[in-house]
Amino acid sequence: MDSVSFEDVAVAFTQEEWALLDPSQKNLYRDVMQEIFRNLASVGNKSEDQNIQDDFKNPGRNLSSHVVERLFEIKEGSQYGETFSQDSNLNLNKKVSTGVKPCECSVCGKVFICHSALHRHILSHIGNKLFECEECPEKLYHCKQCGKAFISLTSVDRHMVTHTSNGPYKGPVYEKPFDFPSVFQMPQSTYTGEKTYKCKHCDKAFNYSSYLREHERTHTGEKPYACKKCGKSFTFSSSLRQHERSHTGEKPYECKECGKAFSRSTYLGIHERTHTGEKPYECIKCGKAFRCSRVLRVHERTHSGEKPYECKQCGKAFKYSSNLCEHERTHTGVKPYGCKECGKSFTSSSALRSHERTHTGEKPYECKKCGKAFSCSSSLRKHERAYMW
């Protein structure tokens, strides 16, 4: 009677892949492996006393990849502890209905009833070549097509897909086809729509406990990710990575049209609309359209009269955060904008620009009635009121 173990269906990372993961992604990996383990346990021998929560305090124990096990031991030993023993493998009776589809070889198309049998078959394609690991005496499998080495048949199977054009690999647990290496990024609850992890503070629910933990920080105010340069803290690791680019100057997202680069992909997306002319965000009051949702929200305040930015010193409210910042300088006395001609300083950049026109003689604001020009818009408005009386 054939059986399938947790190792047969768990996905493994190479050392290089694992090093690229940040803490939140490692937490997600742990959650996905826990989901798979739970699904297998639910159809296995009910008498087996498997303490899943205790097992997953040490996620390295369930990794089939030898290289990743060593990473957990060496890099994160103090956090995760020892690796799993073989006793944690869960043997399942194949006659129990698991919904597993037959496993097909991506090289020759031969079909097998279980993933472990497919692994053994894969050896016929790679030549079953072994050599010693440089880190320890473990034996590694060697691909005869490209020479790459792997410790587990799971990794070999995944790797062989890169040498074929037969399309995506069909995962051993779920019916939906996947392209490695993301085969187990989403557990079954993703496809059923089930969201089992519910927030205690609001009605939101999530597929993964790691997503719930991140969301709960929006309620608690916890910001565990701190910038090493300036000390600023963030709720999410992705926000920290984006912030760090403000120190490094890194701008990895480049416009193909003009070559302008941006620190965030969202900024690039907004910029690209300057080339396409796309303005997908439309005001329902007046029909005016905008390139990004933020500008639309700011515009909508001209209709609603909303002034969400309030001064803590005097209570005066403003439509825009920039106006609040300028106003607060009237309390602090800070004048960061200095004139290069005479050295006079101002609280806002607009006030500086108006002042600079006294040096250049520029008068861009012209009265439509009489043609008289002014250096600042406020002077033009005062002049226009004279016609109203």
UniProtKB/Swiss-Prot annotation:
GO molecular function: DNA-binding transcription factor activity, RNA polymerase II-specific; RNA polymerase II cis-regulatory region sequence-specific DNA binding; zinc ion binding
SUPFAM superfamilies: beta-beta-alpha zinc fingers, KRAB domain (Kruppel-associated box)
CDD domains: KRAB_A-box
GO cellular component: nucleus
Zinc finger intervals, C2H2-type: 103-125, 141-163, 197-219, 225-247, 253-275, 281-303, 309-331, 337-359, 365-387
PROSITE patterns per record: KRAB (PS50805), ZINC_FINGER_C2H2_1 (PS00028), ZINC_FINGER_C2H2_2 (PS50157)
Stretches assigned to the KRAB domain: 4-90
Keyword Transit peptide attributed: no
Signal peptide per UniProt: none
Modified residues (Phosphotyrosine): 281
ATP-binding found in the keyword field: no
One Gene Ontology term from the biological process aspect of the record: lipid metabolic process
Annotated keywords: DNA-binding, Metal-binding, Nucleus, Phosphoprotein, Repeat, Transcription, Transcription regulation, Zinc, Zinc-finger
Pfam families assigned: KRAB, zf-C2H2, zf-H2C2_2
Gene3D superfamilies associated with the record: 6.10.140.140, Classic Zinc Finger (3.30.160.60)
Domain of life per record: Eukaryota
Cell location: Nucleus
Known role: May be involved in transcriptional regulation.
Record-linked PANTHER family: ZINC FINGER PROTEIN, ZINC FINGER PROTEIN 709-LIKE
Protein family: Belongs to the krueppel C2H2-type zinc-finger protein family.
Protein name in the entry: Zinc finger protein 670
Biological source species: Homo sapiens
